Every structure is written in C-alpha cells, then in structure tokens.
C-alpha cells in the first residue's frame, strides 16, 4: 500500500464507492444503539417488499466492552460502516472486494477469507446467513443475508455489509492500537476518544444509577407501547432503542441476573416485533410507495387491496 488513508478518508472512499453502486448516503441515527443493524435505516427497511439501498457510518455503543481507554482494541463506542441493499445484488461479494481495492488492499496479495458465521440478534428477533471476512487473520467485516427481521421473514432478501472501521483503519495504517489511528492529518484517534472512553467506562461500570436505569426501562417500554397504540412506528422504535441501551447499561453494571437478563431481552424483542409488523402494515396502507407502479399494482392486487 502506498498512501495510508486516514480514518476519515476511509469513510469518504467507502461513501463514494457505495454511492456509485446506487446507495443513498444516510447519516448516523441520533439514538444510542449497539450496532448499525439497529438503525431504522436497516431494521425497518429490511422488511417489506420495497427496495432499499443505503450506506452510512454508525457509532455503536456497547457499555460492557468499555475498557477505560486502556485496551488497544476494546471500546465502549466503535464505528461501523453499514451497507444495506435490497434486493441483494448477485455480485455483492465482488463489489465488497472492489471496495477493499480502493482502500489499497489488493485481494490477490492478501489472505481474504469468508468464514461462515450465521448472525442472530435475539433482542430484535432478527437472524440471517452470514460470514465474517478475515483479512490476513483479522476480522474486518460481517456479511449477512437477512432471513428474519423483527420476527418477520424478509422478502426480497436484504444483504448487509458491516465494516469495522477501527479494525480496518488499524490494518491499513499498520498500527497496533486504535488510539494510534490517524483520524485526520495530524490528529490521532486517541486525541479525540481516549477521554470519552474512560468516562463512559467509569459511568457504565461504577457510577450509573441502577434504580434510575431500572425505572427508565419501565418508562421507555410503556411509552413504546403507547406510541404503538397510536400507530406511531418511528417514535415507538426510538423507545425500543432506548430500552435496548438502558438494558445494556444495566447489564454492564451487573444489575440483572441471568434469569432477569433473558426476561429483559424478551421484552425488547416483543416490542421490536410489534414495531416491525406495524411498519409493514403502514407501508402497505400507503401503497408501498418505493415500488415501481407495475410491481406495486400486482402486489396490492395479490394482497387483496
């Protein structure tokens, strides 16, 4: 590799590449979440018959993974570059390899392996066939073909490509610690994120108010249900995300037992399933506006509209 791309240049390169493949460039969703998959730009749009092609960077918070800014590879918050394409292009893996070449990684010169790793997210009732992508022995990407999202079967199938930006940048820049990654010319990752990592880790493991969080979970769950009673899908899903993040904080604090943990996950999953069903029903009521006219008329006729 000749020029070592900065973190932001990696993002810009991926944005331009997937824009050229027909993806809309979305912005990060303004609610805490554990993965780019949980953004409504993936979770909601992966279900139903309408096409959807989008790419976006998603900061992803995982309180239990925080290490006070001291571990070179474990983070409270990391960044994913998320690509979702529905229906899935037949050449999606080839497109992915092309994107690596633009980042200076020639597939012919490196050991790139697709290692089977079927994916499941119990808290959202989602699952799919998947592969981890290993670059010279290090996982850099997760490939998933969704089979179920929010408890609903996906048709057409959505392909998801999730790049781990910190890992990818560490490899490209040949550094052993994420904190040594060059975010922009002259600015290191650690200069931006070391202190927030320390503070969020301290909060997650030592300072968070368990009683407050337990009460918040109950209130967020109730508000999600109230929104769903009013058929307000997007506000309801916002509260599902808040429930998920609140649970993750409780889990990191050790505030829930193994039995309670399963119960909390089931409660989040049940909400997510109702959100998914309500969203699809709403899109149908609107006449599936993202479908072309011929397909829309045929589908609505088949569904008895």
Curated annotation (Swiss-Prot):
Source superkingdom: Bacteria
A GO CC term assigned to this protein in UniProt: cytosol
Listed Pfam families: tRNA-synt_2e (PF02091)
Coiled coil regions in record: none
Catalysed conversion reaction: tRNA(Gly) + glycine + ATP = glycyl-tRNA(Gly) + AMP + diphosphate
EC number of this enzyme: 6.1.1.14
Primary site of residence: cytoplasm
A biological-process GO annotation: glycyl-tRNA aminoacylation
Cellular compartments annotated: Cytoplasm
GO MF entries: ATP binding; catalytic activity, acting on a protein; glycine-tRNA ligase activity; transferase activity
UniProt cross-references to PROSITE patterns, sorted A to Z: AA_TRNA_LIGASE_II_GLYAB (PS50861)
Alphabetical keyword list: Aminoacyl-tRNA synthetase, ATP-binding, Cytoplasm, Ligase, Nucleotide-binding, Protein biosynthesis
InterPro entries in the record: aa-tRNA-synth_II/BPL/LPL, Gly-tRNA-synth_heterodimer, Gly-tRNA_ligase_asu
Quaternary context: Tetramer of two alpha and two beta subunits.
Family under the similarity heading: Belongs to the class-II aminoacyl-tRNA synthetase family.
The name this protein goes by in its record: Glycine--tRNA ligase alpha subunit
Gene that produces this protein: glyQ
């Amino acid at each position: 590799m000749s020029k070592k791309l900065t973190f932001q240049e990696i993002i810009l390169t991926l944005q331009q590449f997937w824009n050229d493949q027909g993806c809309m460039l979305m912005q990060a969703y303004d609610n805490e979440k554990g993965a780019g998959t949980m953004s409504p730009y993936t979770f909601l749009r992966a279900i139903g018959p309408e096409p959807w092609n989008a790419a976006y960077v998603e900061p992803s918070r995982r309180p239990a993974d925080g290490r006070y800014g001291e571990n070179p590879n474990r983070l409270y918050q990391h960044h994913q570059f998320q690509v979702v394409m529905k229906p899935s292009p037949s050449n999606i893996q080839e497109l992915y390899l092309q994107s690596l070449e633009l980042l200076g990684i020639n597939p012919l010169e490196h050991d790139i392996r697709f290692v089977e790793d079927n994916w499941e997210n119990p808290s959202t009732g989602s699952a799919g066939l998947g592969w981890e992508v290993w670059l010279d022995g290090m996982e850099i990407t997760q490939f998933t073909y969704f089979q179920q999202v929010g408890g609903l079967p996906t048709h057409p199938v959505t392909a998801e490509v999730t790049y781990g930006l910190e890992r990818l940048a560490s490899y490209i820049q040949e550094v052993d610690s994420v904190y040594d990654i060059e975010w922009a010319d002259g600015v290191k990752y650690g200069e931006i994120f070391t202190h927030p990592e320390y503070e969020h880790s301290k909060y997650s493991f030592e300072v968070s108010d368990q009683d407050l969080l337990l009460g918040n979970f109950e209130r967020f769950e109730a508000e999600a249900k109230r929104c769903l009673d009013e058929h307000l899908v997007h506000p309801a899903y916002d509260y599902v995300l808040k429930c998920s993040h609140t649970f993750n904080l409780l889990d990191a604090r050790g505030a829930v037992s193994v039995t309670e943990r399963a119960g909390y996950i089931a409660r989040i999953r049940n909400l997510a399933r109702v959100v998914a069903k309500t969203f699809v029903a709403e899109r149908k009521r609107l006449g599936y506006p993202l479908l072309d006219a011929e397909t829309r008329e045929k589908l609505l006729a088949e569904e008895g509209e």
